[in-house]
Swiss-Prot record:
A GO BP annotation: ribosome disassembly
Protein name as it appears in the record: Translation initiation factor IF-3
Signal sequence region: none
Annotated compartments: Cytoplasm
Organism name: Blochmanniella floridana
Amino acid sequence: MQSFRLHRINREITIKKIRLTGADGKQIGVVNFNEAIKQAEDLELDLVEISPNSDPPVCKIMNYGKFLYEKNKSTKEQKKKQKIIHIKEIKFRPGTDEGDYQVKLRNIIKFLNDGYKIKITLRFRGGELIHQQIGVRVLHRISQDLHDLMTVEIFPNKVEGRQMTMILAPKKKPV
């Protein structure tokens, strides 16, 4: 049973004429397949089909195992360099008391210092929905209290369902 490969190599290539690139990366030109496979075998390397859709297909003489190793290594390096953005959510209500507000504010400051984005959700219950301006004031107060630590990415213009949502991101620290 043959395993799936990204590229056809050596005798798997069925085209008679190919555009050949040498092991050093220089263009050799359009050659017969048998001549190309002979050159690869003389160098004890593989003939790898790089671009099968071009006319004629492009093949390169290389060490296929080393090529796959380098490719896997570079994709792992790229994954390491990617930064995953975590979002922490803090919930408020229009009538959140001062003590609770301060505790939640401390948590937001801690999360911002740790580099997290913050999703602040302001939930309305019952008749509170009539007083949307109170909710907007709470969100403005939060942004005023934290203006030196964060930037507001999304500020709500209206109530969505029974809640308003604001997204905060930590300010970039000077290097």
